Amino acid sequence: MSRWPLPEPMQSALDAARRGESAGEVPIGAVVVKDGVVIAAAHNAPRALHDPTAHAEMLVIRQAAAALGNERLDGCELWVTLEPCAMCAGAIAHARISRLYYAAPDPKGGAVEHGARVFDHDQCLHRPEVYSGMGEAAASALLRDFFRSRR
């Protein structure tokens, strides 16, 4: 248990993950914050949308871009409960997200600190500031309990 309360955006991302779990999706949630205000929230929805790209990060980036009327999300923060995969990390770079906060590492599928390490490549034209670990215990417990219940 953390000595400090989680920042509100990570609480919101965890809430989105719980909504996804209730819908039968893998419990991963994400929010986009602009000027201290959550402007978009989403959870994984590949099953519901019959879309393998419907990761929480992809959906929330689309929502935020629509809300701002701009495909560039300069000055925005993305808060997500799990380390983004290569696809999502690429979308984060293309959207020009300024800061990425993720709760739990993903040694198998993550592509920020693990695997492809997308932001470390010369071909990556934008690199957000990256912060990890806030909310790790809660996000990891959600995922662990979800998969345990399905085995």
PLM regions and their residue ranges:
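A short, polar/charged loop-to-alpha-helix boundary motif
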Residues: 48-58
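A short, polar/acidic, helix/strand-boundary loop motif
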Residues: 2, 46-47
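Small-residue (primarily alanine) positions within well-ordered alpha-helices
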Residues: 13, 17-20, 30, 40, ...
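Short beta->alpha transition motifs characteristic of CBS
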Residues: 39-46
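Short, basic and Ser/Thr-rich N-terminal targeting/leader segments
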Residues: 24-28, 74
